[in-house]
Amino acid sequence: MRHLISMRDIGREEILNILDESERMEAILNEKGHCDFLNGRILATLFYEPSTRTRLSFETAMKRLGGNVIGFTDISNTSVTKGESLADTIKVISGYSDLIAIRHPSEGAARLSSENSKVPVINAGDGSNQHPTQTLLDLYTIKREVGHIENLKIAFIGDLKYGRTVHSLCQALSLFKGVEIKLISPDELKMPREVIEDIAGKIKLSEMADVDIDDVDVVYMTRIQKERFVDVNEYYKVKGIYRLSKEHIGEKNVVIMHPLPRVDEIDSEVDNIPQARYFKQSFYGVPVRMAILKLLFEDSVK
């Protein structure tokens, strides 16, 4: 694995290898808290968009591996404001670092970065396109909290149009046998047809507007992403259309996930019920990103 740009680029066996390595990283975290696999190495985090969990978990992962971090979170302090191209930025920074993690508002920015980098590039989210490291930590959460990925029944609820985490996860799940997916969203926020076409025939799909979480293993809630709407009035038409409460969950044997941040789509009272795993899901970002960084670096020096 040279870069991690899209879930389309990696197969089932590579996914399972990353999940196995993530389990080893979690064990290290629990036993010692750190290791020296990437001692003396540098990760560059280039965040052209705001981030809390992804950026901080990448930085934590690199430091837990014994490495160091450079980067930026505010492009107003960079040469981007002078008109420097993304390609030139990557060519320069890949000379300073051993790995690069980039988040960018433009679809395809991570791919372009990988084409201009001397070191492995990790897509930390490119517009509404892909978010592969989130997908891998989602799969790890499912494996750890549900116990299986094959024959999984999962309901995605909310913004399925702009939600890059949903796009990536659906594509990854299509590699596993017996998966059934419910896509629950308003018409304005349906899953893009190209994603549907990509996974059609590989998994059982059903689309609906009304919430139906009976007979599922996982409920995957998503935020309605105001920042992706061209017309803010369209956002307010769908804002708050789905809100998960304790009453919805009841005694169901289900795992509730959310890529976070949350706005109003999950009541805060849900946080304290045993089915809620979204904060555990967020924690898993550290061992999973440790595994990704370690494996990418090892492959780059072979």
Curated annotation (Swiss-Prot):
Q: Where on this chain does L-aspartate bind?
A: K82, R164, R223
Pathway in which this enzyme or protein is active: Pyrimidine metabolism; UMP biosynthesis via de novo pathway; (S)-dihydroorotate from bicarbonate: step 2/3
This protein's UniProt keywords: Pyrimidine biosynthesis, Transferase
Q: Tell me the PROSITE patterns matching this sequence.
A: CARBAMOYLTRANSFERASE
For the biological process aspect of GO, one term held by this record is: 'de novo' pyrimidine nucleobase biosynthetic process
Among InterPro entries, the record links this protein to:
Asp/Orn_carbamoyltranf_P-bd (IPR006132), Asp/Orn_carbamoylTrfase (IPR006130), Asp/Orn_carbamoylTrfase_sf (IPR036901), Asp_carbamoyltransf (IPR002082), Asp_carbamoyltransf_Asp/Orn-bd (IPR006131)
What is catalyzed by this enzyme? carbamoyl phosphate + L-aspartate = N-carbamoyl-L-aspartate + phosphate + H(+)
Molecular functions per Gene Ontology: amino acid binding; aspartate carbamoyltransferase activity
Q: Does the keyword Protein transport apply?
A: no
The entry's carbamoyl phosphate-binding residues are R53, T54, R103, H131, Q134, L260, P261
What's the Enzyme Commission number for this chain? 2.1.3.2
Question: Subunit arrangement?
Answer: Heterooligomer of catalytic and regulatory chains.
Q: What does this protein do?
A: Catalyzes the condensation of carbamoyl phosphate and aspartate to form carbamoyl aspartate and inorganic phosphate, the committed step in the de novo pyrimidine nucleotide biosynthesis pathway.
Q: Which family does it belong to?
A: Belongs to the aspartate/ornithine carbamoyltransferase superfamily. ATCase family.
Q: Which HAMAP family match?
A: Asp_carb_tr (MF_00001)
**What is the protein name for this chain?**
Aspartate carbamoyltransferase catalytic subunit
Where does this protein come from, organism-wise? Methanococcus maripaludis (strain DSM 14266 / JCM 13030 / NBRC 101832 / S2 / LL)
Q: Which gene encodes it?
A: pyrB
